[in-house]
Amino acid sequence: MLKEFKEFALKGNVVDMAVGIIIGGAFTGIVKSLVGDVLTPPLGLLLNGVDFTNLFVVLKEGATPGPYLALEQAQSAGAVTLNYGLFINAFISFVIMAVAVFFLVRGINRLRKMTEKPPEPAAAPDTKECPFCFSAIPVKAVRCPNCTSQL
């Protein structure tokens, strides 16, 4: 059983998948930082200084009544909130991740096509059909060996 597990774990596909998951986790952190620290602040400035992380709707007030200026205030007061600003950040992250994966897969597919050998042309047939008896005969035959017809 240990031998079977070792064979499974050391297969190329399993190792490749593990590397992909690790790199994907690191890439997720980079994309989250790109969205939260680089893209949404200028976008917020264009929208009169809106901070997307603080875009929320209070569904039910908490122990201390509102208004709450920041999401952290509402959450610390125990308010139930609908955090659509965090959803916008997550959606932007998803779009960036999807575009990055699309271009990565597209590049890999192009490389794969470049390294693939073109298919070999089909060999010319070495037999043909006799028009009189319909049996298979060599292409170069001038007389059918079965019905002795002149071809």
UniProtKB/Swiss-Prot annotation:
Domain of life where this protein originates: Bacteria
Cell location: Cell inner membrane
Entry keywords, A to Z: Cell inner membrane, Cell membrane, Ion channel, Ion transport, Membrane, Transmembrane, Transmembrane helix, Transport
Pfam families listed in its UniProt record: MscL (PF01741)
An example Gene Ontology CC term for this record: plasma membrane
Primary subcellular site in the record, as a coarse category: membrane
A GO MF label: mechanosensitive monoatomic ion channel activity
Protein family (similarity comment): Belongs to the MscL family.
Assembly and oligomerization: Homopentamer.
Protein name as catalogued: Large-conductance mechanosensitive channel
Species for this entry: Chlorobaculum parvum (strain DSM 263 / NCIMB 8327)
